Amino acid sequence: MIEGIILKGLLEICCGSFEDVKTAWQNGADRVELNSALYLGGLTPSTANLICAKEQCSIPIITMVRPRGGGFCYSQDEYETMLLDARILLEHGADGIAFGFLTADHAIHRNRTQEMIDLIHSAGKEAVFHRAFDCVAQQERAVEALISLGADRILTSGGAPDVWSGRTQLQKLQSQYLSLIHISEP
């Protein structure tokens, strides 16, 4: 399954497999986000899918790090697994990592987010906070937290189920924080 968005002339496609990445690349995608289980909102892809995609496609590949569906508040074991997944994916050529950590009260989990961003940036890659952002209680506060933590990009539909429904909030966030962080549609 392939879903796409256009960001200021940049076509990014959300892909669920190596085959999807190859199809997106052959059809003009500028960048892809590699996942598995898109029907669950996207989960961590296998390292083999990333390796095959990097060997055969010449576009940037952002990989999702998410161990399960069902929310963005993780146990310590899940969190440690996510850091290891990110490290392995970066070692195998991921151009960035899409991730999201929330607290039980629907705020950005600052410590975990900072540690993940530091790991990603230590590899010189892009830190993308994914649609966990759509579950936060206070979006402006969340954007400011992500800016202060050093996130490079936020994927959001403005807190709504889809971009069209959240377009007013999305446009507000984009205009308010345009010079500080890239906020894009999933």
State what each model feature region is.
Residues Y39-C57, T103-L119, V136-R141, P161-Q174:
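Active-site-adjacent beta->alpha loops and helix N-cap segments on the catalytic face
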Residues I181-P186:
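Residue-level detector of conserved catalytic or cofactor/ligand-binding positions
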Residues E12-C14, R31-E33, I62, A98, ...:
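Conserved beta-strand positions in the central sheet of alpha/beta enzyme cores
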Residues I6-G16, P67-T81, V128-Q138:
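Active-site mouth loops of central-metabolism enzymes
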Residues A24, L89, H130, I154:
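Conserved, mostly hydrophobic/aromatic
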Residues P60-R110:
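Glycine/small-residue-rich loop that forms an oxyanion/phosphate-binding "nest" at active or ligand-binding sites
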Residues G16-T23, E78-I88, A137-E144:
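Short, acidic/polar
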